[in-house]
């Protein structure tokens, strides 16, 4: 099975919602942006159990950005570790092609 980071890095030039289940059984959603160099930026936990288009847009407005030229992938891996993303609690990556519309598909990598 490909790692979550590898799966995200293969999806070029997309916004994603990364959905995980926390240890207290709550769903947490993280926003991720990729480009042709792989993962570019991501946001901390901002919303849960809500796929409303306005909420999706707010994730990116509140997102914490990191430079891909300054060890970003290491930072992203540490981020995934810090929220304890594993194959057991990783739900889906939802591509968001248009910030004004809902995700048009859901990809499962586990």
Task: Give the residues covered by each predicted segment.
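A structural detector for beta-sheet-dominated domains
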Residues: 20-21, 33-35, 86, 94-96
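Short aromatic-glycine-(Arg/Gly/Cys) micro-motifs in beta-strand/loop hairpins
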Residues: 12-30, 52-55
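Short, mixed-charge low-complexity intrinsically disordered segments
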Residues: 49-110
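A short, exposed loop/beta-hairpin motif centered on an aromatic-Gly-Thr core
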Residues: 26-48, 65-67
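Proteolytic processing junctions in secreted/extracellular precursors
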Residues: 4-6, 10, 81
């Amino acid at each position: 099975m490909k790692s979550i980071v590898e799966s995200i890095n293969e999806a070029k030039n997309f916004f994603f919602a990364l959905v995980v289940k926390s240890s207290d059984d709550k769903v947490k959603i993280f926003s991720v942006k990729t480009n042709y160099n792989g993962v570019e930026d991501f946001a901390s936990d901002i919303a849960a159990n809500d796929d409303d288009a306005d909420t999706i847009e707010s994730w990116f407005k509140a997102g914490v950005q990191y430079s891909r030229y300054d060890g970003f992938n290491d930072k992203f891996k540490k981020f995934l570790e810090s929220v304890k993303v594993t194959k057991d609690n990783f739900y889906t990556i939802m591509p968001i092609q248009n910030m004004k519309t809902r995700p048009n598909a859901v990809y499962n990598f586990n």
